[in-house]
Amino acid sequence: MAQTTRKSTIRKEKNSFTSGVVHIQSTFNNTIVTITNLTGDTISWASAGSSGFKGARKSTPFAAQTAAEKAALEALSTGMKTVEILVKGQGSGRETAIRAIEGAGFDIISIQDITSVPHNGCRPPKRRRV
């Protein structure tokens, strides 16, 4: 009978980071939370869509909170403790995503709003008539 041999697999070690940056991009339709280390390499990310919300529910504050908690739990498992928060956009999930990051157990160093403001750039979308 032939002997079966096991192939040795090389496991990739998870790097541990103590501090990082939380990028929260909040649009009118979705909220995307990306957690990176200080050099900008992505450690974890989550969005309202990847957290199981579809359609109009993606733009709710609860969906943003769920996405932020999901990304935070994955980053906490790498040993991250202190974060800076960069918020971009004017969607409804901005504040709740920040509260969810704070509630997950991170020490927040700073919160910055990096929303870009056009100097009369592109024409805005037309007004809705409902």
UniProtKB/Swiss-Prot annotation:
Subunit architecture = Part of the 30S ribosomal subunit.
User: Chief localization class?
Assistant: plastid
Q: PROSITE patterns in the record, alphabetically? A: RIBOSOMAL_S11
Family from the record: Belongs to the universal ribosomal protein uS11 family.
Q: Does the keyword Transport apply?
A: no
Please list the GO terms describing molecular function: rRNA binding; structural constituent of ribosome
Q: Name one GO cellular component term.
A: ribonucleoprotein complex
UniProt keyword list = Chloroplast, Plastid, Ribonucleoprotein, Ribosomal protein, RNA-binding, rRNA-binding
KW Ribonucleoprotein (keyword) present = yes
Q: Which terms under GO biological process does the entry name?
A: translation
* Name by which UniProt lists this protein: Small ribosomal subunit protein uS11c
Question: Any idea where this protein resides?
Answer: Plastid, Chloroplast
HAMAP family in the cross-refs: Ribosomal_uS11 (MF_01310)
